Regions:
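Intrinsically disordered, low-complexity linker/terminal regions across diverse proteins
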Residues: 226, 261-264, 283, 287, ...
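Noncatalytic, helix-rich "gating/capping" subdomain that lines the substrate-entry/channel surface
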Residues: 89-381, 385
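Bacterial N-terminal signal peptides that target proteins for export
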Residues: 1-7
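Active-site-surrounding "flap" and adjacent substrate/cofactor-binding loops of secreted or lumenal enzymes
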Residues: 42-45, 50-110
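Short, Gly/Pro- and small/polar-rich lid/capping loops
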Residues: 23-35
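Structural recognition of the beta-strand scaffold that forms the well-ordered cores
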Residues: 46-49, 173, 483-485, 520
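C-terminal motif of bacterial Sec signal peptides marking the signal peptidase cleavage site
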Residues: 17-18
Length: 656
């Protein structure tokens, strides 16, 4: 039986007149900015336009962005705050080897455009020459490992992460990577828009070869090699939809089995170069793509192999070299693929670089200055209330059997919650920041991160480690540790407002909390037990009922025409759509329960319920370029914000 969910926004239709008479002081208390609304729209017909139309009109996309929304604006504010912290350090001398010296010096190196342009492509010249002078196929495998340590990834990647069948322990794992355009569809699909991007990529590769000194003939030859290698890889790669099956991505092999299954691949040289020579087993994520990589490595003529690896170096280093390289890199990856019109100013790129290479060092400074203890305390209460409400929803699910409910509630009760920042900060004492070149420092930063990662191989998982920096405007659920994490960076307006009442905060950050919790029970998360192991805890009947309900959501998002002739991918975005839908419902239930004893007043003509839904929709206010719509349809597991707010509020769906 289909049950129609129309969450209670109908009252908007009766009160649109009152919505335009708020006072500024009341707006701050309510958390709703009336300038963000479009009161000419009917909320019962187009709630997204009503809630976000004013904001979209007043916030056109800046030239340096492919899309511009709440996440972007908050990230911009954070970046300005971080800029102030970093520039203060960069303005003075510090003890050599101190965090202050590393942060300040790296920023100055990235900002020094005079030196970058004077050096040109010299920082990668020796590496280019080495790759162009390969004498023996055996040396390629060691080179692949050395390059990965420096952040240059070709063919395949090895990493250390939780063993999904034994989540308390770390294991070495392989994963398909290496396509320069990111998604296999750009190599395989032949519609006009995709073909146009592919042709632009060919021109880009040729131009980049020439910028580092190749003549036209050699550059054109390089283009053909890159397209041949990456098209062959793309044909063997799993799609993003196929990658959503965690069981298919788990194929543990002993070193002996690896050598048997991929006999031409020099595993000893590769693992040794990655500082993993003692590893005796690897979890292979996608055996077919690894097989394709092994075949190409074994058969591609050595000269062509060198050309391809030179391209991977050029592609990885481009943004750290002179203006000509950085601008050409931007022209394809941002302007062509996403529609971005201008490169970000250098200071923004410098802040992003420092915040990435020395993430927790920057994060520690950030939270000390900008994250109040009261914000963490209020978040703890919100999380607790949403956890209780999700538990109540699970207990009341008519379609789920008792035995599955018991397991679901056990999993919910064991959520590991992280808020704001880690209790222990990373130690960057062994990372060297020197004044040689931007690229050399990025290589050392990547080598430092690699060493930190491989040191975990075969050791217990540290459940207190954070997978995001505190300054990040995002949140996550990690199934292998059964944790939800909300960095300090996202705990600000419009997601969280210490000056707004619960109606606003449950509608904004409350939905984000509910979203991450629901991930523990989406199409992927539900396959992991309370301990983070890939283990089926559902009865066959309950799993079937879940799949039936999930298919309804797939069908809804498949039917959305996001651009003329281009439709959403309901299967690829299923996990995020389930989390968005569940997060909204859980947050609303928690909000009603939290305010039942002391109902909130009407503010500015808005009921508490209306403020809740306006806060929710306001989070998704976003302007986006047509090119980025097409790009995200191929690459992003998240649906566009417009459809999230419209569908999850008003779309009929099976009871979840």
């Amino acid at each position: 039986m289909r049950v129609f969910h129309f969450l209670p926004i109908a009252a908007f239709c009766l009160m649109t007149g009152a919505c335009s008479t708020g006072k500024k002081q009341a707006e701050l208390t309510a958390g709703i900015q009336f300038a963000n609304l479009d009161t000419t729209a009917l909320p019962g017909t187009d709630f997204y336009q009503y809630a976000c139309g004013g904001w979209m009109k007043n916030n056109p996309i800046p030239a340096e962005y492919s899309q511009y929304g709440s996440f972007t604006i908050l990230a911009e504010n954070n970046r300005k705050q971080i800029q102030g912290l970093i520039e203060e350090l960069a303005a003075t001398q510090h003890e050599a080897g101190s965090v202050a010296q590393k942060v300040g010096d790296l920023y100055k190196i990235v900002m020094d455009s005079v030196k970058l342009n004077k050096d040109g492509v010299a920082p990668i010249k020796a590496e280019l020459d080495r790759l162009g002078a390969l004498k023996d196929r055996k040396e390629v495998y060691a080179l692949l490992g050395e390059m990965q340590k420096k952040g240059i990834v070709a063919y395949n990647v090895l990493y250390v992460g939780a063993d999904e069948m034994n989540s308390s322990m770390n294991a070495v794992q392989s994963y398909q990577v290496g396509l320069s355009m990111g998604e296999r569809e750009y190599y395989l699909e032949n519609d006009e828009a995709t073909a146009k991007i592919r042709n632009a990529f060919r021109a880009h590769v040729q131009k980049m070869y020439q910028l580092v000194g190749f003549d036209e003939a050699a550059a054109k030859k390089g283009v053909e090699v890159v397209m041949d290698v990456e098209t062959r890889l793309a044909k063997a790669f799993r799609s993003r939809t196929e990658l959503r099956n965690p069981h298919a991505n788990y194929n543990k092999m002993s070193l002996e089995e690896l050598k048997k299954n991929y006999p031409t691949f020099d595993w000893d040289a590769y693992l040794s170069a990655l500082d993993l020579k003692d590893v005796q087993e690897v979890i292979v994520g996608q055996p077919a793509s690894l097989k394709a990589a092994a075949e190409i490595l074994d058969t591609l003529p050595l000269e062509q192999q060198g050309l391809y690896l030179q391209w991977k170096l050029i592609d990885a280093a481009a943004g750290t070299l002179n203006d000509a390289m950085a601008e050409q890199n931007f022209d394809f990856y941002q302007r062509t693929m996403s529609g971005t019109q201008e490169m970000q100013p250098r200071w923004k790129r410098a802040v992003s670089t420092v915040s990435s290479a020395l993430g927790e060092a920057v994060g520690q400074m950030y939270v000390e200055k900008y994250f109040p203890a009261a914000a963490k305390e209020r978040m703890v209460t919100l999380v607790k209330n949403l956890q209780e409400s999700l538990g109540e929803r699970i207990k009341n699910l008519a379609w789920m059997g008792d035995s599955t409910k018991v397991k679901a509630l056990e999993k919910l009760a064991t959520f590991h919650v992280k808020i704001g920042y880690p209790d222990t900060w990373k130690d960057y004492s062994t990372l060297e920041i020197k004044d040689d070149s931007y690229w050399a420092n990025m290589e050392r930063a990547n080598e430092w991160s690699h060493a930190e990662m491989v040191a975990k191989a075969g050791k217990p998982v540290d459940k207190d480690e954070w997978l995001m920096t505190p300054q990040t405007v995002n949140a996550y659920y990690n199934p292998t540790t059964n944790e939800i994490c909300f960095p300090a960076g996202i705990l600000q307006y419009p997601f969280f407002d210490m000056n707004a009442d619960d109606a606003f905060n449950y509608g904004a950050i409350g939905v984000v909390i509910g979203h991450e919790m629901t991930h523990g029970f989406d199409d992927q998360g539900r396959q992991y037990d309370k301990d983070g192991n890939l283990k089926d805890w559902w009865t066959e009947e309950d799993a079937k009922r879940f799949d039936e309900r999930a298919q309804v959501m797939v069908n809804v998002f498949d039917s959305i025409e996001v651009a003329p002739g281009v439709y959403g991918n309901g299967r690829m975005t299923l996990g995020e759509n389930i989390a968005d839908h569940g997060g909204l419902q859980v947050a609303y239930q928690a909000f009603k329960k939290a305010t039942a004893a002391n109902p909130l007043p009407v503010m500015n003509g808005l009921t508490p319920e209306q403020r809740f839904f306006l806060a929710y929709a306001g989070v998704w206010g976003n302007n986006i370029r047509p090119e980025e719509v097409l790009n995200r349809t191929k690459s992003d597991v998240h649906s566009l914000g417009k459809w999230l707010s419209l569908i999850h509020i008003s779309e009929p769906t099976r009871r979840s």
